[in-house]
Amino acid sequence: MADYTEEDKQKVLAQLSKKTWKIPELAKILKMDKKVVKKIVQDLINEGVAGYWSSGSTTYVATKEYIEELEKKRAEG
């Protein structure tokens, strides 16, 4: 199982609050192992802090707050 520190988790969370990410892109920019990032993201989703968002063709991850902003913009057209 992929282990990570609270600092790693905070780095991921900080990026998720800025934009939507595909996990491989997020791992690359943070210079972290993709499996570790995937585990952190899954834990954040389980905690209700992050979530998945689909553009229609691609699935991304971001914080719940960022996703809500995107959905408002999408609804406004």
UniProtKB/Swiss-Prot annotation:
Report the function annotation for this chain: May play an essential role in dissimilatory sulfite reduction.
Q: Which domain of life is it from?
A: Archaea
The record's similarity note reads: To D.vulgaris DsvD.
Q: Where is the organism placed in the taxonomic lineage, from the top?
A: Archaea, Methanobacteriati, Methanobacteriota, Archaeoglobi, Archaeoglobales
Name-wise, this protein is Protein DsrD
InterPro entries listed in its UniProt record:
DsrD (IPR014793), WH-like_DNA-bd_sf (IPR036388), WH_DNA-bd_sf (IPR036390)
Instruction: Mention any Pfam family matching this sequence.
Output: DsrD
Q: Which gene encodes it?
A: dsrD
